[in-house]
Amino acid sequence: MNLEAYFPVLLFIVVGVGLGLALMTIGRVLGPNNPDPDKLSPYECGFEAFEDARMKFDVRYYLIAILFILFDLETAFLFPWGVALREIGWPGFFAMGVFLLEFLVGFVYIWKKGALDWE
């Protein structure tokens, strides 16, 4: 296996990480650092904060967010499939059918488990 072909990729990664670290270090060293309580408090539309900004969220918010991301990715995979359906033919159609069936089974599972109920 010829590893010399990967040298430009390695060089790109090293330069990118090095440049990023250098810029963050320069900003940290040269930037002003004068914190006070008003700057460190959360901004809430010009009003005094109603509650602590560091309060814990209900786990259901995270669950709904994760489920949204999963089904959003499913939709993102459906668009190219719909565009290329004529070129991929029946094998692509059946492959997408299996893909959709897996997500349908997952959706029914989370529905039956009550993950979508908000009580």
From Swiss-Prot:
It is an enzyme of class 7 (translocase). The chain crosses the membrane at residues 7-27, 63-83, 88-108. Its EC number is 7.1.1.-. The keyword Cell membrane applies. The keyword Cell inner membrane applies. Pfam families: Oxidored_q4. It is found in: Cell inner membrane. It comes from the Bacteria. InterPro entries: NAD(P)H_OxRDtase_bac/plastid (IPR023043), NADH_UbQ/plastoQ_OxRdtase_su3 (IPR000440), NDAH_ubi_oxred_su3_sf (IPR038430). It is a multi-pass membrane protein. Its main location: membrane. It catalyses: a quinone + NADH + 5 H(+)(in) = a quinol + NAD(+) + 4 H(+)(out). Keywords: Cell inner membrane, Cell membrane, Membrane, NAD, Quinone, Translocase, Transmembrane, Transmembrane helix, Transport, Ubiquinone. GO terms for cellular component: NADH dehydrogenase complex; plasma membrane. GO terms for molecular function: NADH dehydrogenase (ubiquinone) activity; NADH:ubiquinone reductase (non-electrogenic) activity; quinone binding. NDH-1 shuttles electrons from NADH, via FMN and iron-sulfur (Fe-S) centers, to quinones in the respiratory chain. The immediate electron acceptor for the enzyme in this species is believed to be ubiquinone. Couples the redox reaction to proton translocation (for every two electrons transferred, four hydrogen ions are translocated across the cytoplasmic membrane), and thus conserves the redox energy in a proton gradient. PANTHER family: NADH-UBIQUINONE OXIDOREDUCTASE CHAIN 3. Belongs to the complex I subunit 3 family. NDH-1 is composed of 14 different subunits. Subunits NuoA, H, J, K, L, M, N constitute the membrane sector of the complex. This is NADH-quinone oxidoreductase subunit A.
